[in-house]
Design a protein with these regions (language model features):
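Individual transmembrane alpha-helices with interfacial aromatic-anchor signatures
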Residues: 159-172
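Bulky hydrophobic segments
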Residues: 1-159, 175-180
Length: 180
């Protein structure tokens, strides 16, 4: 379990380190757009905006890092194949082994990571639950395709696993957040 939790330390530090710079960079455009749309800026809007920036920064760092130090050597050594079988994690529940805890935690964290997106969709856009469902699925698909393509060709191979179950759990997490 500690190994699983340790895998979050570098992305967490990266996102928290990068967040203040993004806030400074995006504050003026956010305030200008808010003034144009609503003609006022409230503290709750500022707090919500900074929280959203932190969420999306964290999402990027958690889903795309760590990156391989030597991409060419990584690609020659590892051949990551997409996991395209929906609900294959059920086998680990029915027949537990040494990976069951890790896989369970990964599924739970995928749901947890997308709950804030659903909350954001409901609070900011005031749309129907179908909007949250579609948004969660599309953002999750963007992340998975980014992982599958090695950040759209920046890396010579896929260095993260494309997993169809991530699409399912992330979309569910977004919908759950919308329902809260």
């Amino acid at each position: 379990m500690l190994k699983f939790l340790n895998s979050f330390s570098a992305p967490l530090i990266g996102s928290l380190s990068f967040w203040p710079f993004l806030c400074i960079l995006l504050t003026i455009p956010f305030i200008i757009s808010r003034l144009i749309m609503r003609r006022r800026v409230t503290w709750s809007y500022v707090f919500f905006s900074y929280g959203s920036i932190l969420y999306f920064t964290g999402l990027i760092f958690f889903t795309l890092s760590p990156v391989p130090k030597d991409p060419i050597a990584f690609c020659q050594t590892y051949h990551i194949q997409p996991q395209l079988i929906p609900f294959n994690w059920v086998n680990y529940v029915v027949h537990p082994d040494k990976d069951t805890l890790y896989i369970t935690l990964q599924l739970v964290m995928n749901i947890v990571f997308f709950v804030p997106l659903g909350i954001f969709m409901k609070a900011y856009f005031h749309k129907h639950w179908k909007f949250a469902l579609l948004s969660g699925f599309l953002l999750s698909m963007l992340i998975e395709v980014t992982q599958l393509t090695g950040v759209f060709g920046l890396y010579p191979c896929s260095y993260r696993l494309f997993d169809v179950n991530d699409l399912i759990t992330n979309t569910f997490g977004c919908l759950l957040g919308f329902m809260l």
